[in-house]
């Protein structure tokens, strides 16, 4: 009797959704305090002035202003927010 056992299932066929990382606000764009500027894995870009660093390395604005990217001497890009002048009442 010629017989063949059932073949095992393929080990492929899975994929995970993208993590939506990257720059969310580009240089010169206006941001409000709390806006996410960059979502990243590790500190590919470092925080400068008026920005915070989340525990997942997200860089976010601490003040209202304009985003500024600058390359420093050590070769890393630093992200800052230049604060908008406060309107006199």
Swiss-Prot record:
Keywords: Ribonucleoprotein, Ribosomal protein. InterPro entries: Ribosomal_bL27, Ribosomal_bL27_CS. GO terms for biological process: translation. HAMAP family: Ribosomal_bL27. Residues 1-22 are annotated as: Disordered. Belongs to the bacterial ribosomal protein bL27 family. This is Large ribosomal subunit protein bL27. It comes from Gluconacetobacter diazotrophicus (strain ATCC 49037 / DSM 5601 / CCUG 37298 / CIP 103539 / LMG 7603 / PAl5). GO terms for molecular function: structural constituent of ribosome. GO terms for cellular component: cytosolic large ribosomal subunit.
């Amino acid at each position: 009797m010629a017989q063949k056992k059932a073949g095992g299932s393929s080990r492929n066929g899975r994929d995970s959704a993208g993590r939506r990382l990257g720059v969310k606000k580009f240089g010169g764009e206006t941001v409000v305090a709390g806006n996410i500027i960059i979502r990243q894995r590790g500190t590919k870009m470092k925080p400068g002035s008026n920005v915070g660093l989340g525990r997942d390395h997200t860089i976010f604005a601490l003040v209202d202003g304009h985003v500024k990217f600058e390359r420093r001497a050590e070769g890393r890009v630093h992200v800052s927010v230049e604060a908008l002048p406060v309107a006199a009442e």
